[in-house]
């Protein structure tokens, strides 16, 4: 069983030291330009999950509350990538999208590379839940600023799966 305090420390350190930091290979942008504000305002909820599908089903019932993002962390050895991915995709299709929610995944077994930069947290299987409509508005704002210009098309196609493509 994962220790919730260790998980929180690890994920917040990853956010502060990578996700929020501008990178030259990403056009000088941070991987997520909104992460720092969410972290500093306390609108990130990090939980140790039990079962990805059912955790997300409960999240769809409860909603986001005051949070911009709800992150469930799992031991990737207990949830291999194929099983984890399918659970998250099923959750999106079966109940999250109709509640204006979207779950994005991060799993150490599925390396996400953008212009030579590894985007993964690397230690945990993560499901990151956000408001779909807010995510679409934010993506459009960033597209208007040129945020996606340096990102590979193949990566963007998968990123905007189940979402409005702002480009």
Annotated model-derived regions:
Residues 1-167:
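Expand to "…catalyze enediolate/carbanion chemistry for C-C bond making/breaking, isomerization
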